[in-house]
């Protein structure tokens, strides 16, 4: 394959580097859900640097296989799009990460109202709160019928899950 061979000579390195460049997108797509996220991201970044250097050499350098570089560029762009789509929910959950508190009762102006576990639970978003039995702990005072959580540290919203 022309570009790497002209860069590395006609030796073994050029041949294996070509096969590496062609096989890594397939390997990344196959191992996307097997490997950990960090391994996936590091492999994709390493591959992107190798591919960027390769395409730069093909387009700017003295190689003749420009069409080959554009095929690799298209494969790389598909890989990047797939990686972005795959990472967006994770990034969103990292930035919006809050622990969930599940309560079995709601305090209303007329008194605490129990919520059967079989039908509905009130899930409260808050930082570091926990539920023990029917009591909310870690600074949570009460959940009102309006669905607002009042605590010493912050206020969060209670959601009913059907």
Swiss-Prot record:
InterPro entries: Arteri_GP5. Coiled coil: none annotated. Residues 1-10, 62-67 are virion surface. The keyword Magnesium does not apply. The chain crosses the membrane at residues 11-31, 41-61, 68-88. Residues 32-40, 89-162 are intravirion. Pfam families: Arteri_Gl (PF00951). It is a multi-pass membrane protein. The keyword Nucleus does not apply. Keywords: Disulfide bond, Host membrane, Membrane, Transmembrane, Transmembrane helix, Viral envelope protein, Virion. It is found in: Virion membrane; Host membrane. One of its GO terms (cellular component) is viral envelope. Belongs to the arteriviridae membrane protein family. Heterodimer with glycoprotein 5; disulfide-linked. This heterodimerization is required for transport to the Golgi complex. Major envelope protein. This is Membrane protein. It comes from Equine arteritis virus (strain Bucyrus) (EAV). The lineage of its organism: Viruses, Riboviria, Orthornavirae, Pisuviricota, Pisoniviricetes.
